[in-house]
Amino acid sequence: MKTAISLPDETFDRVSRRASELGMSRSEFFTKAAQRYLHELDAQLLTGQIDRALESIHGTDEAEALAVANAYRVLETMDDEW
């Protein structure tokens, strides 16, 4: 899909240089950057959900250990292509 975006000249120049250094097109660079940012946002959301779950069961060490173990299982199933 083609789209047009506006960005500061300095950012455009930096992206152009770095994409060239990496041997990729600007489109590929922006695609990878957007995917990485979306992955980061998803991870932050998941971290917040884990924190809230821990707060809701705050009390016993056993319950906290179980919640942490479950959180690690969820994180291990996430796709991490970077």
Curated annotation (Swiss-Prot):
Job description of the protein: Antitoxin component of a type II toxin-antitoxin (TA) system. Upon expression in E.coli and in M.smegmatis counteracts the ribonuclease activity of cognate toxin MazF6.
Superkingdom per UniProt: Bacteria
Induction conditions: Strongly induced (about 10-fold) by nitrosative stress.
Protein name: Antitoxin MazE6
Recorded GO MF terms: DNA binding; toxin sequestering activity
InterPro entries registered for this protein in UniProt: Arc_rbn_hlx_hlx, CopG, Ribbon_hlx_hlx
Subunit structure: Forms a complex with cognate toxin MazF6 which neutralizes the toxin. Interacts physically with non-cognate toxins VapC27 and VapC40.
Annotated phenotype, changing residue 26 to A: No DNA-binding
Keyword annotations of the record: DNA-binding, Toxin-antitoxin system
Source species: Mycobacterium tuberculosis (strain ATCC 25618 / H37Rv)
A biological process term (GO) from this entry: regulation of DNA-templated transcription
